[in-house]
Amino acid sequence: MASLKELKDRIGSVKSTQKITKAKQMVAAAKLRRAQANAEAARPYAERLADVMASLAGKVSGDSAPRLLAGSGNDQKHLLVVVNTDKGLCGGLNSNIVKEAKAQAKKLIAAGKDVQFYLVGKKGRAPIKRDYEKQIAKHFDTSTVKQPGFEEADAIANELIDMFEAGEFDVAHLVYPTFKSALVQDPTTNQLIPVPSPEGEGTGGDAVVEYEPGEEEILEELLPRYVKTQLFGALLEREASEQGASMTAMDNATRNAGDLINKLTIQYNRSRQAAITTELIEIIAGAEAL
């Protein structure tokens, strides 16, 4: 059985840890409000851009379609762009993203496809490297930036487009967390490159719209911007998901610390009471012996 001093020291240690987790919970809650607002504000822009893309793509024939829309003509080499966080202490967020990425990789490999990874964020590297060390093409470090934004999305998009133009992959899939709430962040996989062709969208109500200088020229400009917007949205969703998961994890840790403190306090009081009782018995026994 632990001594009273050991129990007292342990209670003090858990209380110190509880203060840290409580502080981290409050910081995450404050950051979450801003991150959630940024993620939600970016969604309408991405949706509207997708509508415009659908309208333009419906007016372009296959031969004149830009490469980013038409694709390479092959479907053999696939690249999984996996967006993880740079920091830990956010529950099972990163493990869920990695699990989704590995599931997509297994599905593609089972279909006879070649799979490579492009990793964004530090926390996904080690678990993916364990199973797919030779299939990691590149990684992009966002840990040096306090708040990754459009500049980072632009850099990632440019590198991916260059890789696509060089024939390093035929199809790129974006794997990232979608923020639902502080309790729910769903791993999502969307095709990024070539830009998915619309299915029955943008050809009806927009049929009378004429574009200048022309659909092909506008698409050449908008397609890279669409890729950058998708990556920017993924980074914003990642930030909101990270803060939500971190707030929830730290709240659980604070509650668990409180439960442990209560148990240790009861154990301490019982041990102290037993020690006092033992001392009293010894004193009484000594007095009777005299």
Swiss-Prot record:
It is found in: Cell inner membrane. InterPro entries: ATP_synth_F1_ATPase_gsu, ATP_synth_F1_gsu, ATP_synth_F1_gsu_CS. The keyword Cell membrane applies. It comes from the Bacteria. GO terms for molecular function: ATP binding; proton-transporting ATP synthase activity, rotational mechanism. Its main location: membrane. Keywords: ATP synthesis, Cell inner membrane, Cell membrane, CF(1), Hydrogen ion transport, Ion transport, Membrane, Transport. Pfam families: ATP-synt (PF00231). It is a peripheral membrane protein. PROSITE patterns: ATPASE_GAMMA (PS00153). Signal peptide: none annotated. One of its GO terms (biological process) is proton motive force-driven plasma membrane ATP synthesis. Transmembrane segments: none annotated. Belongs to the ATPase gamma chain family. This is ATP synthase gamma chain. It comes from Erythrobacter litoralis (strain HTCC2594). The gene is atpG.
